[in-house]
A protein has these predicted regions:
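Long amphipathic alpha-helical segments
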Residues: 1-68
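Short Gly/Ser/Thr- and Asp/Glu-enriched loop/turn motifs at secondary-structure junctions
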Residues: 9-10, 77-81, 290-293, 396, ...
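Glycine-rich phosphate-binding segment of PLP-dependent enzymes
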Residues: 39, 79-80, 90-116
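Short, flexible active-site-proximal loops enriched in glycine and acidic residues
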Residues: 68-79, 108-118, 139-140
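A short linear hydrophobic-aromatic micro-motif
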Residues: 72-73, 284, 422-427
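Conserved PLP-enzyme active-site core in the AAT-like
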Residues: 118-334, 451
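Conserved PLP-dependent catalytic core of the aminotransferase class-I/II
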Residues: 323-324, 328-387
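Conserved C-terminal alpha-helix-loop-beta "cap" of PLP-dependent enzymes
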Residues: 358-441
Length: 455
């Protein structure tokens, strides 16, 4: 077949006539999408990447426009085994909880209105009470992520002055969040002390001057340094700060509201235990080990929390009613004896290998023998990580479905799963494709079985 030329391209009007009855979108928006796709295809034609007849080209364009005009944020099956997957929105939500929140958020809500007094309220009040009770703090504040929490606190307390941090705690997490960069953007000056592997109390003491505004203690939650190491206990830093009248702040990263050891997970010190050291402020994430929406949680002394809330940056970083509602629902789940069932992240992280094996067998039982043979499907033991830099040393037991297809490339199989009517994202290792069951929701097992059958 001869190569497609630019003359073979249909007009916007022609494509519009073909699809206007299939898509209930405004013509102006459809024209925008059609033009966007036509521009892409012009480039592909010039590169000689398309060989289609005019009619085939029209069908091809219509298919692309239909895909582009469909909702882009869709429900997927997470077959990576990573429960707190950043690319998939970190902590997953319980459908029942979402429905409850949706009902409460319909129409108007008392976000900043006190129903008892009939006067203006504070959107932070309810969250503040929940967090203070769970964390043992005087007060609390919520902003849109932990990076925002750290930046707001440093800007308010240390703008124009120095922030003392151990060199061993100058962390970087995904998305290029670096402590030195956050300090700089907050308007403060980094004063790093000690070395990468060893920092002593005297290093902090020698660095204190009349320029010092804050001592920052950062939890290296996404990596561990072993061997010839030393770090200063938080209690010593708090005492040092108190002696010199310098506030001490903790960036606790992932954060956990309970003892992970009790759930047979790695030892992650609960936030409440850290607060027993009496730091002035502590920040952590709401969408990692806590299992809530994207948010940055700030707890600590009432004096400092109130000061942060009066900073103009708070207005820029504050959360909306949807985040507040979801976070409240998440925190409320910790008051229940069945919190591991209500909190989807904790539920999946603690699901035993035995249960996952049973789910995997159900999926295999659904498949025809020929399908299992053609795709080379086996149920195998696996190990996964929590994700998002949480519990970095903990390898969590799991089960996975492995695929070694006879007549299909691994990349084709992976693409077929991703782009199917039920999107499934797994991972490839060597010449094998895997769908790990750790992060597959219980209600998705039948859908996953159908997705395998359809691939």
């Amino acid at each position: 077949m001869k190569k497609t030329s630019l003359k073979d391209l249909p007009s916007v009007h022609q494509v519009l006539l073909e699809i206007k009855d299939d898509i209930s979108l405004h013509n102006n928006y459809l024209k925008f999408i059609i033009n966007k796709e036509l521009d892409k295809i012009r480039g592909e034609i010039k590169e000689g990447e398309i060989s289609k007849s005019p009619q085939e080209l029209l069908v091809y364009i219509i298919d692309r426009v239909l895909i582009e005009s469909a909702p882009q944020l869709v429900n997927i099956i997470n077959g990576t085994g990573i429960v707190l997957h950043t690319g998939f929105g970190r902590a997953p939500f319980n459908g029942r909880a979402l429905k409850g929140i949706a009902d409460r958020l319909e129409g108007y809500v008392n976000l900043e209105f006190d129903l008892q007094t009939g006067k203006r309220g504070d959107r932070q009040d309810n969250i503040r009470d929940h967090l203070s009770a769970l964390c043992g703090s005087e007060s609390a504040l919520v902003v849109n992520n932990n990076a925002a929490a750290v930046m707001l606190a440093i800007n308010e307390i240390a703008q124009g002055g120095e922030v003392i941090v151990s060199r061993g705690q100058l962390v970087e997490i995904g998305g290029s969040f670096r402590i030195p960069d956050i300090i700089e953007k907050s308007g403060a000056i980094l004063k790093d002390v000690g070395t990468t592997n060893r920092t002593h109390s005297k290093d902090y003491g020698n660095a204190i001057s009349n320029k010092t505004k804050l001592i920052l203690w950062v939890h290296t939650s996404n990596y561990v340094v072993r061997g010839f190491t030393r770090s200063v206990p938080l209690s010593e830093l708090v005492a040092l700060g108190k002696k010199h009248k310098i506030p001490v702040m903790v960036d606790w990263g992932s954060g956990a509201l309970l003892d992970m050891n009790s759930l047979n997970l790695a030892d992650e010190i609960p936030v409440k235990t850290i607060m027993e050291n009496n730091p002035d402020l502590l920040t952590f994430s709401g969408d990692k080990l806590i299992g809530g929406p994207q948010s940055g949680l700030i707890i600590g002394k009432k004096k400092w929390v109130n000061t942060l809330q009066n900073n103009p940056l708070y207005r820029v970083l504050r959360c909306d009613k949807i985040t507040i509602g979801l976070l409240e629902e998440t925190l409320r789940s910790y008051r229940s004896d069945s919190f591991t069932k209500d909190n989807l992240s904790l539920s999946m992280l603690t699901t035993s290998r035995r249960i996952l094996k049973n789910r995997g067998q159900r999926i295999l039982d659904f498949q025809k023998r020929k399908k299992i043979k053609d795709l080379g499907i086996k149920l195998v033991e696996s190990e996964v990580e929590a994700g998002s830099g949480s519990l970095p040393e903990d390898k969590i037991e799991s089960m996975a479905l492995s695929f070694k297809p006879k007549s299909m490339k691994i990349t084709e199989l992976a693409g077929g799963f991703r782009c199917g009517s039920i999107p499934v994202v797994g991972y490839t290792s060597g010449h094998t494709f895997y769908i790990d069951l750790k992060a597959v929701l219980p209600g998705q097992i039948n859908r996953l079985a159908k997705a395998i059958d359809q691939v």
